[in-house]
Amino acid sequence: AIPSVNELLTEWPVVKAAGETCDAVVHAAVTAELDEERAAIRAGAAPRSKRDLASAIEWRAHRSALPSLRPAVNATGVVIHTNLGRAPLAESAAKAVAEVARGYSTLEYSVDTCSRGSRKEHAAQLIRSLTGAEDALVVNNNAAAVLLVLATHAAGKEVIVSRGELVEIGGSFRIPDVMAASGAKLVEVGATNRTHLADYEQAITPDTAMILKVHPSNYRIEGFHEEVGSRELAALAHKHGLLFYEDQGSGALLPDDILVRGGEETTPASVSAGLDLVSCS
């Protein structure tokens, strides 16, 4: 007969596992192991002894209690790999994080005024210095930034985007879906491979809130192709009293020869070009 849950909970390996993890983890391990045991017996396998079941439960409990986030070896050939944590922290940066995280900190306290401060200011002041922007805000990722920008500045209003920039990025980030979630109204202009300045201007109505330019990220259109640059779109938006917002995708804070050869703009360059809003990750 299959041992009961109570019987297994008194076995030493299970008792030991409960002391090293917690009761909830052990109870879940017992339930899962018994479910597997019943399925195996129905399939014709011989029943395991109580001791074997207890050892299996101990192993399962310890395994389920392990952190799911752990170091990995990146052998993919992709240096900045989204699924593997993107850019590793420098040793000095990791040390600085650990130094602050192991105790109390001035997260939301201003030493200058001896009063409550702003938790966003720590990163914001650094980003302002790096980019020349008037202000900055750090959120979870660029997808969150896009949603927040659209919901804040264009909910219930129209946002003009080129058809060739209605991209889908890994993790099911799709521009039309994010637009719908924000409450903004998507206005597609141009063709998939060619969009002209006149296409944007002709789409402007009294309900237009902004013009959006989206970086295509890991795909490109080649051959018979044309797109409008950010500076031209910013000038058009300002001519009509609209906001111009550039979703840079990954973005880059510092210039790099490879980026320059690829025709990529850095975030500081976009800010200095007069763009109203820029987001990147």
Tell me the role of every PLM-derived stretch.
Residues A1-S64:
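Long amphipathic alpha-helical segments
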Residues C114-S281:
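Conserved PLP-enzyme active-site core in the AAT-like
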Residues S64-A75, Y104-C114, D135-A136:
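Short, flexible active-site-proximal loops enriched in glycine and acidic residues
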Residues A43-L89, A93-V97:
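Long amphipathic N-terminal alpha/beta scaffold segment
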Residues V30-T31, D35, A75-T76, R86-D112:
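Glycine-rich phosphate-binding segment of PLP-dependent enzymes
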Residues V79-N83, S110, I160-S162:
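Short glycine-rich or small-residue beta-strand-to-loop segments that form or flank ligand, phosphate
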